[in-house]
Curated annotation (Swiss-Prot):
Gene3D superfamilies: Flavinator of succinate dehydrogenase (1.10.150.250). The keyword Cytoplasm applies. An FAD assembly protein, which accelerates covalent attachment of the cofactor into other proteins. Plays an essential role in the assembly of succinate dehydrogenase (SDH, respiratory complex II), an enzyme complex that is a component of both the tricarboxylic acid cycle and the electron transport chain, and which couples the oxidation of succinate to fumarate with the reduction of ubiquinone (coenzyme Q) to ubiquinol. Required for flavinylation (covalent attachment of FAD) of the flavoprotein subunit SdhA of SDH and other flavinylated proteins as well. This is FAD assembly factor SdhE. InterPro entries: SDH, SDH_sf, SdhE_FAD_assembly_factor.
Length: 91
């Protein structure tokens, strides 16, 4: 296997892992995260990709409150990612 094939396989594995992490206990979050990974994740900078992955470590009730506008995330990077996802994903 060439280095290019190895890189492609690693990207596919990472994308599959991300999509699995996007499957939440709340459908409202699933319909935001899964399309975002499919349509926008690859276009993000490495820093923003890490920020998105950090966002996925949050608890569902907290994430739901941020995305529904009930609360504002105090972490500026995470808040910017929430806003980007809301802008990119039309629900």
């Amino acid at each position: 296997m060439t280095n290019n094939e190895n890189s492609t396989n690693l990207l596919k594995v990472n994308k599959a892992r991300l999509k699995w992490a996007c499957r939440r206990g709340m459908l409202e979050l699933d319909v935001l995260f899964i399309p975002f990974v499919d349509e926008a994740y690859d276009e993000l900078s490495t820093k923003d990709q890490f920020t998105f992955e950090r966002l996925l470590t949050g608890q569902d009730p907290e994430l739901f409150a941020w995305f529904m506008g009930h609360e504002v995330c105090e972490d500026t990077e995470l808040n910017a990612m929430v806003q980007l996802i809301l802008k990119r994903v039309k629900v």
